[in-house]
Regions:
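Conserved catalytic-core segment of nucleotide-activated headgroup transferases in glycan assembly
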Residues: 1-23
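Short alpha-helical segment that forms part of, or immediately flanks, the ligand-binding pocket
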Residues: 26, 49-53, 67-68
Length: 138
């Protein structure tokens, strides 16, 4: 994290959400412009997805399962362990956010696609379809 400090503008701050209760973490995510993903060997990296759906640019590691949804401009992948490139991509993301990235049509379209594929409504539809298939099997 100390690598990042030289690139961090004075009006920006880093707020760790590790070990926070879910409601507090959700509150932080809803007000965040950038989320740093430190997913390592996770099956499906849920925190980066939650951050992207919340409207933040996500920069960092994909873990294993998050590769399928790490797409620019909303999510910017970094090779696991590449601290220098991680820092540079975060610095680029800060500049992009300051230049208005979060308000661009492309960013909003990317967010909408994530919500459509991974949001609660789709999850509910898939669960209902699963229950119907199970019921039909008996």
């Amino acid at each position: 994290m100390f690598y990042l400090l030289e690139y961090l503008p004075a009006d920006w701050s880093v707020v760790p959400i590790e070990n926070m209760v879910p409601l507090k973490a959700a509150d932080i995510l809803s007000r965040s412009s950038i989320f740093l993903s430190f997913c390592d060997i996770e099956g499906f990296g849920l925190p980066p997805l939650e951050a992207a759906i919340s409207g933040a640019v996500v920069v960092g590691y994909t873990g294993q399962g998050a590769r399928e949804y790490f797409k620019k401009p909303n999510l910017i992948a970094v090779q696991n362990g590449d601290f220098r490139n991680f820092t540079l991509k975060v610095a680029d993301a800060i500049k992009a956010v300051d230049a208005g990235l979060l308000d661009t049509e492309g960013f909003q379209e990317g967010r909408a696609l994530l919500v459509k594929k991974y949001g609660r409504e789709n999850e509910q539809r898939q669960l209902e379809a699963f229950v119907k298939r199970v019921e039909m099997a008996f």
